Each structure stands twice: as C-alpha cells, then as structure tokens.
Amino acid sequence: MASAEPLTALSRWYLYAIHGYFCEVMFTAAWEFVVNLNWKFPGVTSVWALFIYGTSILIVERMYLRLRGRCPLLLRCLIYTLWTYLWEFTTGFILRQFNACPWDYSQFDFDFMGLITLEYAVPWFCGALIMEQFIIRNTLRLRFDKDAEPGEPSGALALANGHVKTD
C-alpha cells in the first residue's frame, strides 16, 4: 500500500491562504449587497490577505492542536476570536506604516484606530467556529501520496464516498 504523508506546513498555509482570500472576497460582496443592495456583488480584497489569512489560520491550527482536549469548543472559538483581533490589529498597524493597509474601520462606532472594530466580533466568532470545525480539521486529514500516479484512482485505492477502500 502506498505511503500517504500529511501535508507540509507550507501546503496547509497555501490552502488556508486561498480559503481566507476567497472568504474575504465573498464577505465583501455580501456586505456590499446588504448595505447598498448592489446586485453586482463586487467582492474585493488585497493580495496582503493571502499572507494575513494563511499565517493566521496556520497559527490557529497550532492552537487547535494544543487546546482541543483541554478546553471546550466555545472557549476555543473565543480564544481564536481574540487572536484574530490581535492579528488584524498587528498586521494592519504594520501595513499602515507603509500606507498599505487595505481596511479602515474608522466609520464604525466601536473601532480602535480604524484597524479593528467590535462590530465584527460575532462574524469573527462564527468564522472561528467554521474554521476549526471544517477548514482546519479537514485540512489536517488530507494526505499527499508522492508515489501516486496522475489520473483516476483504481484498484485497491479507488475512492468510495470520499474514503479510501481498503478491502
């Protein structure tokens, strides 16, 4: 049987970066529709989002692996949300020094320096829940088989409902 290895940290970072980038575009499109009823759904983000999300989710993955047996899900999501605020503030502050910060929350009632806003606490918390339960857990299950041939699976390794057949 082929030896399947877990994805490398760089491979997982890449998946997390692309996922975060996509979610950012979808969120801004939905926000534009809700606030302005814009049926064009123009979703936008910055290339910086790739680094920001990829790195942040990889760090949350490490938190998940350390906390999963030690504290309940809702507490973990609260910790991830606090991390998200710290990371968003830090990366925004650094990018602002180069006039490169792509977001500005100054128009929100509960913003801090225009870099973070409490109005996003519930979306960040829900995002943390989805991130742990679906994105991180499933990404950690992915395997890379360096000996696999390109093409459709066949024989003993044929897939059935997303699971490798072993019989």
UniProtKB/Swiss-Prot annotation:
Q: Which GO terms describe its biological process?
A: macrophage activation; response to bacterium
What residue ranges are annotated as transmembrane? 15-35, 41-61, 74-94, 110-130
Extracellular topological domain: 36-40, 95-109
Task: Look up and give the membrane topology term.
Answer: Multi-pass membrane protein
What PANTHER family does UniProt report for this protein, alphabetically?
TRANSMEMBRANE PROTEIN 229 FAMILY MEMBER, TRANSMEMBRANE PROTEIN 229B
The UniProt entry's sequence similarity note says: Belongs to the TMEM229 family.
The name of this protein is: Transmembrane protein 229B
Q: Tell me what organism the protein belongs to.
A: Homo sapiens
Organism lineage reads as: Eukaryota, Metazoa, Chordata, Craniata, Vertebrata
Which gene is transcribed and translated to give this protein? TMEM229B
